Design a protein with these regions (language model features):
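Outer-membrane beta-barrel biogenesis signature
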Residues: 2-11, 18-34
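Predominantly the C-terminal beta-signal and adjacent terminal strand-loop region
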Residues: 176-231
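Gram-negative (and chloroplast) outer-membrane scaffold detector with strong preference
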Residues: 52-152, 159-166, 174-180, 218-231
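Solvent-exposed loop/turn segments connecting transmembrane beta-strands
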Residues: 34-48, 70, 107
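Short, charged, low-hydrophobicity "junction" segments
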Residues: 37-41, 89-96, 202-203
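Outer-membrane beta-barrel domain signature
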Residues: 38-42, 84-88, 155-160, 210-214
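Short leucine-rich amphipathic alpha-helices used at interfaces
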Residues: 32, 39-40, 151-152, 158-159, ...
Length: 231
């Protein structure tokens, strides 16, 4: 039995050795697609947050298209919010176009670095039911928040905005077998954003916000886990 186990291990080693030379598939004309996960995302949730497509112009140079997305449902504790939150959503959508330069580290391992630019949209909306005590009774009404969500006091809180961004990044690709690979990526980005006009609607009244503002944000890209395939 022990000899059989030794033969199996030896065979596995020979198999990996024979396939490792063809495991790294980064050649001119190769197309790749991958999903990207953020293990340390919002509230430490492990969530899928983007798709990436890659095309190798040469054995070392690749163009990339990245589409990012995410949706979060709002929740309030009963003692923190003055109304009944019927519906609340925060969302994000981004489209980035970039360039990667690849460096062979080993037969199965590739290091790359690059730059990208893109556009970004942050969504925010909510629908809340409030009950007002009038002394001799109560009055219930609904408020629709557009391009914003309420604070725990019912005021305008987080707002929707649009932006443009540029980033630099570096990452690793480890080819498990032929075109299948695992990887990670980190980087930094600079983004210029502008808030959208807010709107509160209740009964027959509409209150539109008059203030919009711009902001410049510089931050690190959270480490991500990537699973991809080249063909």
């Amino acid at each position: 039995m022990k000899n059989v186990k030794c033969l199996l291990v030896a065979g596995l080693i020979l198999f990996v050795g024979n396939t490792s030379a063809e495991s790294r598939r980064q050649k001119v004309g190769i197309f790749g697609t991958e999903v990207q996960f953020t293990p340390f995302g919002h509230d430490d949730d492990y969530s899928l947050n983007s798709l990436k497509f890659r095309y190798f112009m040469t054995d070392k140079d690749a163009l990339r298209l990245k589409i990012g997305f995410g949706v979060e449902s709002l929740k309030y504790e009963d003692d923190e919010f003055g109304g009944n939150l019927e519906k609340g959503r925060l969302g994000d959508l981004s489209v980035d176009l970039g360039y990667e330069r690849h460096f062979k580290v080993a037969k199965r391992l590739s290091l790359y670095a690059g730059v990208q630019v893109g556009v970004y949209k942050h969504f925010a909306s909510a629908k809340v039911e409030y009950t007002e005590d009038l002394g001799n009774g109560s009055h219930t009404y609904q408020v629709v928040y557009k391009n914003c969500v309420p604070t725990s006091e019912g005021n305008v809180g987080e707002r929707a905005h649009v932006g443009v961004a540029a980033s630099v990044f570096t990452g690793l690709d480890f080819y498990v077998y032929k075109g299948l690979y695992l990887g990670t990526e980190v980087g930094i980005y600079v983004m210029s954003t502008k808030t959208n006009q807010t709107e509160l609607k209740y009964s027959d009244k509409v209150i539109k916000g008059t203030d919009t503002y711009r902001a410049v944000i510089c931050n690190a890209i959270k480490p991500m886990v990537r699973l991809g395939w080249t063909f």
